[in-house]
Amino acid sequence: MRIGIVAGELSGDQLGGTLVEALKQKYPNAIIEGIGGPKMAAAGFKSLYPMDALSLIGFLEIISKGLRILSIRRKIINYFKQNKPDIFIGIDAPDFNLTVEKELRSAGIKTIHYVSPKIWVWREYRIKKIRKATDKILAILPFETEYYKNRHKFEAIYVGHPLAKNIPIHIDRAKYRDKLGLKGSSLPILSVLPGSRTTEVSRLLPLFLLALQKLVDAGYKFKAIMPLAKPSLKPLFAKYKEQIDSLGIEVFETNSHDVLKASDLSLLASGTATLEAMLCKLPMVVGYKLSWLSALIGRMLIGNHSYWAFPNILHKNEIIKELIQEDCTVDNLFSELKRLFDDKRRNDYIVEEFEKIHKEMVIDTESKIIQVLDTMIEKS
């Protein structure tokens, strides 16, 4: 059996890593190849091109690096047309993967898109391309199946999110503090996750650090910890080493899971990390900034969509504070961080609601995906 997979960024590599592990258990001799990151490679995946080349955000970055992406996309399409897989799975990265899927499907290859494009937020017109590109959408959010069915008469299958299964409902935080060498700390532990992409981190890290300094100056006592999302961010972190050190922030070259599981509270960028923090039952403050052009175009396409962060989308209310674009200022971050430390009753409520959502999301994701995959291959 031959299976093609393309993941475009770290969150896709996390999903792909657990999926490749499960596929290798079910089909030990399968050739599984395409584009992926370190977690997928560790599970036995062959990456034909570096995943980092696809990890872009914002319209300016796409314009500046777009030619390389287009070249890689054309090469991966040609490769799979010449080395036809039994099935192709595009993990997220819809702007890249839907075109790949469309071309491969037109060549007679079965295609799956894993992680629904957020057409319920913006660019709903993409449903036309989705219909042409993919045989099945695998949704990781519970409400998406009904959205596709009722609004677009298209089948999306809810497969859950692997994190909901892999992260326990009740976390032994002491275990992860011991693992990180934080044993015995009596201070509340605040995880700081300014993003996984260079552009995100360059915009958010300085703001986060200044807000934390104001928190310290106001007399708040805490221990801040931060994961290094990937080695390529080391030079950027080094640029702010003096501030990081003066705040006593410990930077760990480990995955975000361990850092979040060791934490009491979190300050982080909007994105998949907010889902992970929610499953770790962390009251949080979310910040995000795009370039002015990306923000302008994004707002034209999104309109007045209410929420950006996964906890708010899933809860259907602003259960945690989002500070987006011009609202993402040092003063606003500081104000919300103070609230995070001061309002225990609110934090207890947030934890209770996150636990309810977590329980609803638990499903054996990989087994469900393999079941879908088997059915599609049998019918072909």
Curated annotation (Swiss-Prot):
Which molecular function term from Gene Ontology is one that the record holds? lipid-A-disaccharide synthase activity
Q: What class of enzyme is it?
A: transferase
Q: Which family does it belong to?
A: Belongs to the LpxB family.
Its biological function? Condensation of UDP-2,3-diacylglucosamine and 2,3-diacylglucosamine-1-phosphate to form lipid A disaccharide, a precursor of lipid A, a phosphorylated glycolipid that anchors the lipopolysaccharide to the outer membrane of the cell.
**Keyword annotations for this protein?**
Glycosyltransferase, Lipid A biosynthesis, Lipid biosynthesis, Lipid metabolism, Transferase
- GO CC annotation terms, alphabetical: membrane
**Which pathway does the record list?**
Bacterial outer membrane biogenesis; LPS lipid A biosynthesis
The record lists the catalysed reaction(s) as:
a lipid X + a UDP-2-N,3-O-bis[(3R)-3-hydroxyacyl]-alpha-D-glucosamine = a lipid A disaccharide + UDP + H(+)
Which organism encodes this protein?
Answer: Francisella tularensis subsp. holarctica (strain LVS)
Give GO BP annotations, semicolon-separated. lipid A biosynthetic process
Query: Which Enzyme Commission number(s) are listed?
Result: 2.4.1.182
Q: Which InterPro entries does this UniProt record tie to the protein?
A: Glyco_trans_19
* Highest taxon, organism lineage: Bacteria
User: What Pfam families does the record point to?
Assistant: LpxB
Task: Quote the protein name from its UniProt record.
Answer: Lipid-A-disaccharide synthase
